[in-house]
Amino acid sequence: MAKKSMIAKQKRTPKYAVQAYTRCERCGRPHSVIRKFKLCRICFRELAYKGQIPGVKKASW
């Protein structure tokens, strides 16, 4: 889990647009965030296995 101070800091609008970054909406993780779902890879994987993300299925080839 992310620190509460970091989550609060990220909610403020940055002085410059370059300073903005994505953060997982479920756990607050700043790295490896999938933009389309606004989730980190770990949360995305958990929810996909449970079938809670519509239209997502495990790939096999």
Curated annotation (Swiss-Prot):
<protein>
    <recommendedName>
        <fullName>Small ribosomal subunit protein uS14B</fullName>
    </recommendedName>
</protein>
<dbReference type="GO" id="GO:0019843">
    <property type="term" value="F:rRNA binding"/>
</dbReference>
<keyword id="KW-0689">Ribosomal protein</keyword>
<dbReference type="InterPro" id="IPR018271">
    <property type="entry name" value="Ribosomal_uS14_CS"/>
</dbReference>
<keyword id="KW-0479">Metal-binding</keyword>
<dbReference type="InterPro" id="IPR023053">
    <property type="entry name" value="Ribosomal_uS14_bact"/>
</dbReference>
<dbReference type="InterPro" id="IPR001209">
    <property type="entry name" value="Ribosomal_uS14"/>
</dbReference>
<dbReference type="GO" id="GO:0003735">
    <property type="term" value="F:structural constituent of ribosome"/>
</dbReference>
<comment type="similarity">
    <text>Belongs to the universal ribosomal protein uS14 family. Zinc-binding uS14 subfamily.</text>
</comment>
<feature type="binding site">
    <location>
        <position position="43"/>
    </location>
    <ligand>
        <name>Zn(2+)</name>
    </ligand>
</feature>
<feature type="binding site">
    <location>
        <position position="27"/>
    </location>
    <ligand>
        <name>Zn(2+)</name>
    </ligand>
</feature>
<comment type="subunit">
    <text>Part of the 30S ribosomal subunit. Contacts proteins S3 and S10.</text>
</comment>
<dbReference type="Pfam" id="PF00253">
    <property type="entry name" value="Ribosomal_S14"/>
</dbReference>
<feature type="binding site">
    <location>
        <position position="24"/>
    </location>
    <ligand>
        <name>Zn(2+)</name>
    </ligand>
</feature>
<keyword id="KW-0687">Ribonucleoprotein</keyword>
<feature type="binding site">
    <location>
        <position position="40"/>
    </location>
    <ligand>
        <name>Zn(2+)</name>
    </ligand>
</feature>
<dbReference type="GO" id="GO:0006412">
    <property type="term" value="P:translation"/>
</dbReference>
<comment type="function">
    <text>Binds 16S rRNA, required for the assembly of 30S particles and may also be responsible for determining the conformation of the 16S rRNA at the A site.</text>
</comment>
<keyword id="KW-0694">RNA-binding</keyword>
<keyword id="KW-0862">Zinc</keyword>
<dbReference type="GO" id="GO:0008270">
    <property type="term" value="F:zinc ion binding"/>
</dbReference>
<keyword id="KW-0699">rRNA-binding</keyword>
<dbReference type="GO" id="GO:0015935">
    <property type="term" value="C:small ribosomal subunit"/>
</dbReference>
<dbReference type="InterPro" id="IPR043140">
    <property type="entry name" value="Ribosomal_uS14_sf"/>
</dbReference>
